[in-house]
């Protein structure tokens, strides 16, 4: 009976809060990620021979009675020296862990970093707090420089279509507006990103205003029974915060002797008889020449079918490897920034292609793809797409005029397997730019 009482007494004494438990110096971080005002209490690992003074925690007192009785004889000077060294080591580790945790909490803060100025500090701040703020300010300054350099490197890495070409980092830095009324103008100084104005069917046919850049994205849908051979292409205008506005959809007609694409502003009905039918793209037998038409009727005299563009790809009969060479002929622009009406269906006048073959350039504008530069380091052709194109493709191109090769009228390139970017400016409209991009998708027997 006495033995059982003794064991119960010992178990109760060991479980009492006065006994010191072992601790591994873990710091409990709050789940919310916010600062915690509570401080961790650290205990000494192993049997305790000394206790700390309640007035001064750093002062070590002998484990004796309050009356000052001498310590137990088992405590030798050697044990005392070892315990003193262990206590000093534990205190240093605790200070180090506390300092590391404070830096980790600083890194988790999302508030903006402000420069610490000496004249704004209150006189009540002690010298210790001032000294502790200086390394924090240096740490934030280093973090700011690191973030800025990392952002710059990311921009440089995305400046070329696939790899950095060492070109200008500012998009269209020296571009001048072709056809401006005063003959001058900077492509970036007063340039803004375009938005949809009015109805979609009217907007896609209207030439882009001068000084406005339209950033678009083309997605290719190859899902379904026959989408592998006849995919559907969707054109969206990119807006802020990842938003996008649908503009046009296009698909290749199945029963056609040559490549024939239907373009509509109604994504649910991509047929020629649909209300949203905007025009079509038709190629020759070899796929080297494409003509873009609007939604007019070639048999009608009141609203005849108009020519919007002609795209010509240079033939590559010998099969030399390299980028495509393309020529784009557009109708000229009037003084009020409207297209000159040219119709190949009208027997009284010549079409765009006929005018170009006869070198009659009065009412047409000729564009060419910008010649890419060969990079010996990457063993590839590179162009500066200013971060808008991220993957190499034979379809990537930029359209420029010979009089001003720095003014990018249109650029097109791949960002993923079925996603492409398409940016265009004056004098193109969305219908013309989308049709030019569709011609790049089409297979070309004599150009590959």
Curated annotation (Swiss-Prot):
Organismal lineage: Eukaryota, Metazoa, Ecdysozoa, Arthropoda, Hexapoda
Native source species: Drosophila erecta (Fruit fly)
One GO BP annotation of this record: protein localization to cilium
Assigned keywords, A-Z: Cell membrane, Cell projection, Cytoplasm, Membrane, Nucleus, Phosphoprotein
UniProt-recorded name of the protein: Protein king tubby
GO cellular component: a single term: ciliary membrane
Modification Phosphoserine, positions: 141
Segments of this protein annotated with the region Disordered: 103-195
PROSITE patterns noted in UniProt: TUB_1, TUB_2
Predominant localisation class: cytoplasm
InterPro entries membership: Tubby-like_C, Tubby_C, Tubby_C_CS
Gene3D superfamilies referenced in this protein's UniProt entry, alphabetically: Tubby Protein, Chain A
Gly residues: bias regions: 182-191
Similarity comment: Belongs to the TUB family.
Topology in the lipid bilayer: Peripheral membrane protein
């Amino acid at each position: 009976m006495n033995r059982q009482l003794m064991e119960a007494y010992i178990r109760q004494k060991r479980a009492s809060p006065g006994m010191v438990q072992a601790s591994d110096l873990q710091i409990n971080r709050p789940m919310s990620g916010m600062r915690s005002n509570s401080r961790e209490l650290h205990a000494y690992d192993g049997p305790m021979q000394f206790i700390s003074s309640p007035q001064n925690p750093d002062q070590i007192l002998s484990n004796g009675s309050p009356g000052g009785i001498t310590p137990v004889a088992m405590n030798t000077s050697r044990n005392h020296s070892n315990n003193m060294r262990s206590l000093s080591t534990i205190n240093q580790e605790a200070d180090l862990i506390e300092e590391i945790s404070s830096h980790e909490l600083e890194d988790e803060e999302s508030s903006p970093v402000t420069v610490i100025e000496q004249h704004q500090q209150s006189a009540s701040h002690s010298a210790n707090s001032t000294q502790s703020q200086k390394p924090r300010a240096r740490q934030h300054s280093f973090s700011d420089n690191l973030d800025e350099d990392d952002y710059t490197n990311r921009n440089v890495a995305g400046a070329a279509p696939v790899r950095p070409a060492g070109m200008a980092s500012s998009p269209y830095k020296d571009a001048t507006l072709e056809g401006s009324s005063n003959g001058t103008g900077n492509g970036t100084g007063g340039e803004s990103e375009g938005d949809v104005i009015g109805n979609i069917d009217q907007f896609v046919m209207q030439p882009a205003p001068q000084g406005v850049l339209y950033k678009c994205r083309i997605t290719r849908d190859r899902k379904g029974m026959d989408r592998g051979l006849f995919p559907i292409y969707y054109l969206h205008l990119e807006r802020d915060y990842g938003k996008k506005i649908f503009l046009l959809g296009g698909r290749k007609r199945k029963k056609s002797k040559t490549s024939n694409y239907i373009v509509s502003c109604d994504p649910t009905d991509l047929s020629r008889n649909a209300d949203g039918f905007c025009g079509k793209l038709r190629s020759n037998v070899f796929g080297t020449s494409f003509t873009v038409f609007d939604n007019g009727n070639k048999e009608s005299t009141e609203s005849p079918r108009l020519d919007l563009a002609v795209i010509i790809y240079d033939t590559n009969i010998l099969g030399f490897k390299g980028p495509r060479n393309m020529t784009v002929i557009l109708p000229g622009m009037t003084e009020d920034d409207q297209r000159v009406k040219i119709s190949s269906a009208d027997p009284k006048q010549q079409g765009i292609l006929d005018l170009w073959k006869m070198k009659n350039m009065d009412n047409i504008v000729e564009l060419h793809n910008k010649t890419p530069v060969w990079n010996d380091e990457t063993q590839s052709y590179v162009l500066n797409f200013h971060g808008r194109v991220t993957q190499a493709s034979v379809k990537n191109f930029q359209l420029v005029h010979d009089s001003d090769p720095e003014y990018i009228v249109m650029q097109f390139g791949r960002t993923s397997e079925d996603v492409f970017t398409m940016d265009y400016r004056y004098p193109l409209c969305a219908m013309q730019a989308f049709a030019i991009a569709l011609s790049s998708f089409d297979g070309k027997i004599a150009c590959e």
